[in-house]
Every structure is written in C-alpha cells, then in structure tokens.
C-alpha cells in the first residue's frame, strides 16, 4: 500500500492467494475487480461490497517470492464465523449470498474468467470419478460402496445443467460457487 493511500487508523486484510487452486491469479483478480466495481453501481450499502486495495503500481495483487497476495479494506464491526452460533447466523449468511446473486443478475457473466477450469462441469467430474474408481489408488472404494452406488445411479442426470446451458434453456449467470458461512461477513452488532 502506497503511503499516499495510508489513512490513520485504516485497517486492512492481507490474504495470500492459493495459486495451487487458483492457477490463473490474474483472471481471478480481474473477476473480483469487475464484480466489486459492478456491485458498487448497484447498491448504496458500500459496506457490503469488498474494497480491494491496489498496489503502488495500480495492480489488484502482488506477486513476490513465488507467492500471490491481495489486500482488502478491513470491514469494521463485522464478524466471520467458522461455525454458526445461532440459526440466525445461517439465515443472515443466506440473505448475504441471495443479495449478492440478485445484484449480479444483469452482470455480463461471459466477461468472467473460468478460474478453475471445469470445476462445475458435472459430466467431467463424473468421468474423473469413474477413472479414479477404476484405479482405486488408495484402495478405499470398498469402504464407500453405498456412496459410489448413489453417484452411479444418477449418471443420466449428470449432464442436465451442461445440456441446459448449451441449449440456451438455462442462461449463463454469475454465481458465488463457495457459499459457506465463513465466506460471508456478518454485522457484529445485529
């Protein structure tokens, strides 16, 4: 963070990006930049939109010593829960994700990079499952036969989403794809 950007008592969150999972760090950060900038045009509640802090040269992340880093403004009076303390915690996290999805209904999804190729391609995942079952490299398949049979019995349904996308019956939309409790900041006071 450049000294001209430093404000007294301004706090930050510095995150190391897992580039083993997200191999296209530039694409990931372009996605985050595009989505957060778009969200700012859709809501007056700017506290609900992450603020990415740029590097001195205007980049959205830093690559140094084989590691990738990004910085966000710290959201004051917020909490991040690993486990729910009440049913309301789950409800409010669902409200957060629902609001996120609703605000992005008209975002041009085709502009986003696929940061983990085929991660949500169910037929591709199914093929990988079959290949792994055939090899059974850890010799554990016998221990999970009911689960394997459950998946195998649903082969016909595995292509439903990909087919609907390809036919145009299902529009391409932005989704969060990691909707878990600790990916939502909750208001610490309410």
Name the predicted role of every residue range.
Residues 1, 47, 170:
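Structured loop/turn residues at beta-strand edges in well-structured enzyme cores
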Residues 1-7:
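Short, small-residue-biased leader/transition segments that mark boundaries at the very start
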Residues 179:
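Hydrophobic HxD+1 residue recognition
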